[in-house]
UniProtKB/Swiss-Prot annotation:
Protein name: Pumilio domain-containing protein 12
SMART domains on file: Pumilio
UniProt feature, compositional bias: Polar residues: 79-88
Spans traversing the lipid bilayer: none
Pfam family of the protein (one): CPL
The keyword RNA-binding appears for this protein: yes
InterPro entries in the record: ARM-like, ARM-type_fold, CPL_dom, PUM-HD, PUM3, Pumilio_RNA-bd_rpt
GO biological process, one term: regulation of translation
Keyword RNA-binding: yes
Single GO MF annotation: mRNA binding
Matching SUPFAM superfamilies: ARM repeat
Amino acid sequence: MVKLDDKNKKFKGKKKVKNVLEKKAKGLKLNKVDRKRIVKIEEKAALKSKVDKAVKDELERLKKSSSTSVFDNDGTRDSLCSESSFGSQPAPKKKSKKVLFSGELEHVKVFDKRVQDLQIKPSEASPGRGILRSPLDKKVKKLAKVKTVKVAQEEEEEHSAPPKKKVKVNAEKAVASEPADDENLESVDEQAGGDESHIDIPTLKRKRVAIQVTKSVKEQLLNMPRKERKAFLKELKLKRKPEGARAQKCKELWEKIRMGKTPKAEKDTAVHELYGLVKGHAAKLIYAHDTSRVIECLVATEREGIINNLFNELTPEIVRMSKNVYSKFFVKKMLKNGTKEQRDIIINAFRGHAPTLLRIKHAAEVLEYAYNDFANAHQRYNIITEFYGKEFILFREDNIRSLTEILAEKPEKKVVILKHLDEVIGAVNEKETLRLSILHKLMLDFFDNCDEEKKINLLDSLKDKIPEFIHTPDGAKLAIKLIWFAPVKERKLIVKNFKDLSVKAAMEHYGHRVLLALFDTVDDTVLLNKVIVSELANEMKKLIEDDWGEKVIHYLVHPRDGRGIDKREITFLAEGDSNPHSKKTQKDRYGQLYAGITENLYPYLAANFEELVFEANKSKFVAACLETTSSFDLFDRQVPAEARKSCNQAIVELAKKDFVPMDQEGFHIIEHQSGNFILMAVMRCDAALQEDERLSVALAEGLTSKQLGSWVTCNRGCHVLLKMLQVGGPKVIEKLKASISRKHLDGYNSKGANLLKAQLDGNVKK
């Protein structure tokens, strides 16, 4: 029996080793990967030993040469040269793996025996920019000591000869970029073999080269003449960018084509020449920031043959182009301007790649553009179902179904499908792709079919981002369902996130529905009035002039009113009435929200009544704002008395204008369709109001008998007078009887005139 505390006993089980070398030493079985690793490790060890040996030999040679160079010809040691080449400065610290010259200038000094008073000061040279970059992997880089050539200017006295370029040999640590560095060591040895301390080299002008090279290449370049070095760099650049010359020529032609002053004949020639350069090389040119615009220029020429040939050449690159920041514009341009067949080719090319494309910012834009603007219903269904799993990629269906219907038919697939959706949503809802309608559709499907725990997780990840995705139908629907599902604390956070965004949301086609859902469900009306309603009230003109903004104001005045919003929206909003987190009654909630809007609403109506009353699509809104409470209203709405009086006075000012039947310059409010509708709707409520708040009384007191009597000449005017007789008090009836000429009225046989005659006769009899 093995005791637990017995450390000498070996554990009988799977043997653990630290690396493959230990595995080989223990005689364990090696697989193919292990054998390859052992070969690489042995090669690296051999290279390291080879480099270490070369460095060691070189250091010994330098040590011998330095021991002999510090003596004069007579064998005595020179006091000035008794110090090392680094002077009294401390040894340089280990540098990074870039080779720079500025750091070494702080320590490398060239001394001359004739200088008696030697002062060592730190160099003020600005740091240089190294062109050396090691392309090898960090694991392959080895540190080696090699010789570097340093150039310094020798200080001469007044009567000395002209200065000479001298080189000081210094050993330091640098990067061994490749095994061939042994050759570089030998070449440096040969250079240092003549004079141990000084080497004459040709003067070279420093010129920044916009290309990166390895250390070995750099050492070769420093020993080349200027012309040879320039030619070598040009050749090296061409090897790295083989399409460079072609791209430059393409850009020159592109500039000629896009200039407005270029004659048409030259443009045509340049277009054909440019296409000749691009043809066969488009797949390489399309990904660069400059040449991609050249190809887009060819597409913009609207030459069908060129466009078709370019599209056919780039068809295999569609998915890759969609992922690139520059080439994606070619794909979008072909979606917009291409033929139906070309659009189908692009959309079909995305088959099997939709989940990957959605995770990439630029590719997601192209996928959204194709899905939202050009794909038909079946293509959209195929794109969406790719996110349900690989089975839906391989086996496509002709029958379009929702996820709920798919899960009802195949309940065993529910776990797998929801897992795929959860992974996609978790990967992209933190990025800019949150605004894409494809993701909104996926999140809505996921929310409708997942369990309670998943809904809570989705709410936690989206509760502070709801204003970002309410601009699409699926996004707005998801936001509304999240509001219904959210507890009180989360609802307050959602409301606060609409700060400074309420007006923008209210003016959106789908975003305004989310505000209506907040008005229906949030019990904290103080917070709603402070954050949302107050912002809406301050932008009353902008909202009322906007079709969607007017619906939001109408909803605050008349909630669930079929005259303001579609009945299907009312039915959908009613589904949230049964949520478990709303406790306040509708009467109290709507009444408190209405109180927050009245202070700005009615002064605006009174000040802009003439503009509103003659707009056909605003008449229902104005009438609804001035109506009294009916049995269909969800709360007791009371228009402030002063606000109603100011609106009545605005109507009276419009009615005072001279009435000219069928006026070509503009109908009178009595004859205008919208104006007459508002008058009749407001006076219909006079019976329930105090006498001083009635519109009929205001008209009777504000207009002269001549003005009132002139209204009998049109049918609509007779109807207005008839309504005033029916709802007005004794003063109104008396004023109208004195104003209407019965002889004049008998000359008209319109329906309104006949009804007015009957009403007057009835009143006379009474």
